[in-house]
């Protein structure tokens, strides 16, 4: 009998915290399957989900305000362990008969909590031991309200000077609340705390591993598709590349990929995609060379949003044209990942964090009547990368920096021209090449060059050069919601600038963007 990698599962209820997805990712890293649902998930759905444990996440609301969200009653009727984090602890306390009040002393940022209770959750977990034997944890706090009276049968787990009940526990029922955030890296022992809850208290086995996920996904694809044929829009990005590798392993020649080369890709990228998938892996890939069509449609357009729409529409037109030449296609594969699913599921609650979704294909002729196959829809981006490696994709492809869907079309400010794209491609290649040589590529989260349609005077030998300006952009970020500009060494910047100006005739000046997000965005357009 096949292994059920979803058998041991944790339910996470979202009350709107910016950290909720992080909780899910941490649980998955432990090797346990979990799902994230809005706080107002109905009781019957919770019972059907049949979790081994439930985590109530944080949120921006105040428990003692009217109409603030509450956990469904089924959470406390299932007789499974429950961990409340921040707001989750507060609503748990309130719903079970305790009290929550506002506080004049808010706690945001690093804090030390004293572990004052003997519970299974924190037994043997500490960062410090005082001379008098008090155990301490370095944690991350983000709260204004606090629990002032615990429900019956609960004991104090942890405290701070301004928050005497910074944690509470009822070992008999497996109920725990912590006012701090174990899911963020600033809480040093957070991983151990979550592992203790998920594995030791809830009894979940580590079934959710890269190799098991691949085997399970292959079995599911084969069961869904049978002997039918599948079409995939291959972009060369991480998601579509992993889908291609996974489907090829599952169904072989039943998969056909269409790779639209829009002329706005990185240097040699089109050839690299074809070499990897068609030549090395034997995947059926149709390459549509459509540079002229994209550039013709973009001619004269300088507005960033309009450029995006033109590129999107042109892609769909070309993909449709190629797809219509194929016979006997029943399924369309897409690289939908779990954050896209969370967004649509969370929309009804109004509390969930909204994520910009990504779809490889925006539309297909209705007469094709294709069914969707989405083998990555349960996975976070970091999990997609791990199974990419498991499937044998090269590390450099799987961990390549993000590249926008419209490609260089939004890294050329203003109107897009072939001359600009060719210059930008070469400059970007030099920048990335030097980052790799200096061992800075994987220290940055995203790095690229922006073409600016302005000219500047330069001197080359004894002559005057009047040529284009480009900007280097490199950032460090964890979640791409905020980012700081990367403090690259001056020597590295000097090398990159020198190479770009000396090797590319059309550039006379190189600048470095030192804007963080916010207020700036990572991409310029």
UniProtKB/Swiss-Prot annotation:
Domain Glutamine amidotransferase type-1, first and last residues per copy: 9-207
UniProt xrefs under Pfam families: GATase, GMP_synt_C, NAD_synthase
Top-level EC class as recorded in UniProt: ligase
Keyword Ligase (UniProt): yes
Keyword Ligase set for record: yes
Subunit structure, as described in the record: Homodimer.
HAMAP family: GMP_synthase
Official protein name in the record: GMP synthase [glutamine-hydrolyzing]
Organism, as annotated: Pseudomonas putida (strain GB-1)
Lineage: Bacteria, Pseudomonadati, Pseudomonadota, Gammaproteobacteria, Pseudomonadales
Gene label: guaA
